[in-house]
Amino acid sequence: MHTLTIASRESALAMWQAEHIRDRLRELHPECKVNILGMTTRGDQILDVTLSKIGGKGLFVKELEVALAAGEADLAVHSMKDVPMELPPGFELAVIGEREDPRDAFVSNRYARLSDLPPGSVVGTSSLRREAQLRARYPHLTVKPLRGNVGTRLKKLDEGQFDAILLAAAGLKRLGLGARIKSLLSVEESIPAAGQGALGIEIRSGNTAVAAMLAPLNDPVTAACVRAERQVSRVLGGSCQVPLGAHASYKDGRLLLEGFVAKPDGSRFLVDRAEGDASDPEAVGQALADKLLAQGARAVLDALPA
């Protein structure tokens, strides 16, 4: 192929991700011209409502898939945490690339750590996952929704609308904003979203030529971890509308997976772990999902607003 076109959201972070993949592809295939097709998704347009109320993860993906289906693009670059658990017919995930830091970051102009915040402090977050963990572990804090791209969220903090905000560390680091991070939340303190920090590349199903060109970008360890995490989310119906997190780590051919399901107000918080062979990550994810279901996860999920 002489030309490859990458479909991407137009936010600064999404464009960084697309440019990163473009640069890697140019290194791998210097004979090939690689372009980026910037697009605005519905998730980028609706900024006054929390993601959990407007449909969740697929909001950042669908327009890119339309471009793929129409042949306007050959691949789409996503943050894996935004990719729905089931792709529509006609598409496949060709690559799960090497992961940036998967943890959540604490950002504040006044405090060094989440545990330093006094009662009544206002914390901004965009996700039910972070909100549920905050409410469960820090019930004395006030949690308020925070939408917009990374720059917008930081601006709202700097304007004094929040005492602190929580963001994905990966996004801040990729944008060169790592200095804004006051501290990183341990996985025990804030279990990340499935796939957080990893990039995924989606293509049209059966496009073997593009799949072969992308193959060197796949990171087997990250892919195994993310597949296990996504299986937990798949079994439990995870989306932006479900307070759920899962994080896997790899050691000596084994996966250690931790995850939780909670009520949004943190009043019920179920957490567990599973371990298994990295060669079958879905089985490890299924084992953790089964443990959470045995604790009563289904009742928690069924009680969530539709």
Curated annotation (Swiss-Prot):
GO terms for cellular component: cytoplasm. Tetrapolymerization of the monopyrrole PBG into the hydroxymethylbilane pre-uroporphyrinogen in several discrete steps. It comes from Thiobacillus denitrificans (strain ATCC 25259 / T1). This is Porphobilinogen deaminase. One of its GO terms (molecular function) is hydroxymethylbilane synthase activity. The keyword Transferase applies. The porphobilinogen subunits are added to the dipyrromethane group. It catalyses: 4 porphobilinogen + H2O = hydroxymethylbilane + 4 NH4(+). The lineage of its organism: Bacteria, Pseudomonadati, Pseudomonadota, Betaproteobacteria, Nitrosomonadales. It comes from the Bacteria. The modification S-(dipyrrolylmethanemethyl)cysteine is found at C240. Its cofactor is dipyrromethane. CDD domains: PBP2_EcHMBS_like (cd13646). One of its GO terms (biological process) is protoporphyrinogen IX biosynthetic process. Its EC number is 2.5.1.61. Binds 1 dipyrromethane group covalently. Pfam families: Porphobil_deam, Porphobil_deamC. PANTHER family: PORPHOBILINOGEN DEAMINASE. Belongs to the HMBS family. HAMAP family: Porphobil_deam. Monomer. SUPFAM superfamilies: Periplasmic binding protein-like II (SSF53850), Porphobilinogen deaminase (hydroxymethylbilane synthase), C-terminal domain (SSF54782). The gene is hemC. Pathway: Porphyrin-containing compound metabolism; protoporphyrin-IX biosynthesis; coproporphyrinogen-III from 5-aminolevulinate: step 2/4. Keywords: Porphyrin biosynthesis, Transferase. The keyword Transferase applies.
